[in-house]
Amino acid sequence: MNENLENFSTIDLLNELKRRYACLSKPDGRYIFLGAPGSGKGTQSLNLKKSHCYCHLSTGDLLREAAEKKTELGLKIKNIINEGKLVDDQMVLSLVDEKLKTPQCKKGFILDGYPRNVKQAEDLNKLLQKNQTKLDGVFYFNVPDEVLVNRISGRLIHKPSGRIYHKIFNPPKVPFRDDVTNEPLIQREDDNEDVLKKRLTVFKSETSPLISYYKNKNLLINLDATQPANDLEKKISQHIDG
C-alpha cells in the first residue's frame, strides 16, 4: 500500500472515493474565474474543485510557491507581489501550461486569477488550441470596491488546504485556527488596505477589458458576487450542469 495512503483512515479514503465517484456524473469543464481580489473566486473555485473534480489553478498560489523558494527569482517575485504589481506574462503562462498537463486537470480546470489582460487571454487561447481544447465559459465576479476592502482586510487562510475564513463574516470556530485540522491560520502580507488599493487600480486598468473581450466571444457569465456564498455556489453549478 502507498505510504501516503497509510496516513489516512479507511473512512476518509472511502469518503474520498465516494466524492470522486460522484464527480463522474458531472460534466467536464474548462472555466476562468474573473474578478478583483476578494471577489470570492478562491472560495468558489475550491467548492467546484470538490464537487466536480476540476483542478484549481490559482496563479497567485503558483507565484507564492515560487516566491517561497528563496531563490533570486523567488525573492524578485515576492517583492512584486507585495507591491501589488504583476509578474511577467511568459513566466505565468509556463506555470499554467505545466499544471494543465497534470492528471488532476484531465476532467477540467478552473483558472483563478489568470488571464489578467487581453494579451494573456490571447496567449492562453493559443495554448489551449495547441493542446486541442477550449474554454467553456468565463465567470465574472462583480463586487463594489468598498465591499472588497472589507473582505480582504479580515481574510484568514489555511495555507495547506486553501480554506478561507474572515474575522467577521466567516470566522473560524476557534480564533485563528482551521476548523478541520486546528492548524494555525495566516493573513497574507499583501492582504492590507494599501496594497489592495494598488491591486484594484491594476485590476481595473489591466483586467477590466477582459470583460468585453470574453463578452464578444459569448463566453462571459456575469455574477452578482455580493450574494451569500451558498447562493453563489448554486448559481455557478446551475450554469455548469445545465
Swiss-Prot record:
Its main location: cytoplasm. GO terms for cellular component: cytoplasm; cytosol; mitochondrion. GO terms for molecular function: adenylate kinase activity; ATP binding. Transmembrane segments: none annotated. GO terms for biological process: generation of precursor metabolites and energy. Residues 58-87 are annotated as: NMP. Keywords: ATP-binding, Cytoplasm, Kinase, Nucleotide-binding, Transferase. The keyword Ligase does not apply. InterPro entries: Adenyl_kin_sub, Adenylat/UMP-CMP_kin, Adenylat_kinase_CS, Adenylate_kinase_lid-dom, P-loop_NTPase. Gene3D superfamilies: 6.10.250.2370, P-loop containing nucleotide triphosphate hydrolases. Inhibited by the dinucleoside pentaphosphate compound P1,P5-di(adenosine-5') pentaphosphate (AP5A). SUPFAM superfamilies: P-loop containing nucleoside triphosphate hydrolases (SSF52540). Residues 154-191 are annotated as: LID. Optimum pH is 5.5. ATP binds at G38, S39, G40, K41, G42, T43, R155, Y165, A229. The keyword Cell wall biogenesis/degradation does not apply. Belongs to the adenylate kinase family. NCBIfam families: adk, PRK00279.1-3. This is Adenylate kinase 1. It comes from Plasmodium falciparum (isolate 3D7).
